[in-house]
Amino acid sequence: MYAVIRTGGKQYRVAQGDRVKIEKLAGDVGGKVNFDVLLVGGEGEAKVGKPTLAGVTVEGEIVAQGKHKKVIHFRKKKEGWTKKRGHRQPYTEVLITTVRA
């Protein structure tokens, strides 16, 4: 059984036992989180919410808080002017513990 959850303005397809890196959530390592479920499916059938499904829960456990690899943004003009900026996006790694339909 799988589910499509929404968190941090993005959607993720998850199943029980998956580890997912999502946008940073407030919480400590070992804490529990619940997600909005948009779709649940398995064995050739799917239920779609309008916009979310009532009675369906996806629970996860926070495994780690970290930062992604650095992304470098570099701009250069013809006159010799340059600008270099870096950014590391924070993330939360979550272990999906249960998907209940």
Swiss-Prot record:
Subunit composition and interactions: Part of the 50S ribosomal subunit. Contacts protein L20.
InterPro entries: bL21-like, bL21-like_sf, Ribosomal_bL21
Upper lineage: Bacteria, Pseudomonadati, Myxococcota, Myxococcia, Myxococcales
Top-rank lineage group of the source organism: Bacteria
Species whose genome carries this gene: Anaeromyxobacter dehalogenans (strain 2CP-C)
GO molecular function: rRNA binding; structural constituent of ribosome
The entry's keywords: Ribonucleoprotein, Ribosomal protein, RNA-binding, rRNA-binding
Described purpose of this protein according to its UniProt entry: This protein binds to 23S rRNA in the presence of protein L20.
GO cellular component: cytoplasm; ribonucleoprotein complex; ribosome
Protein name: Large ribosomal subunit protein bL21
Family: Belongs to the bacterial ribosomal protein bL21 family.
GO biological process: translation
Keyword 4Fe-4S (UniProt): no
SUPFAM superfamilies given in the database record: L21p-like
Pfam family, one: Ribosomal_L21p
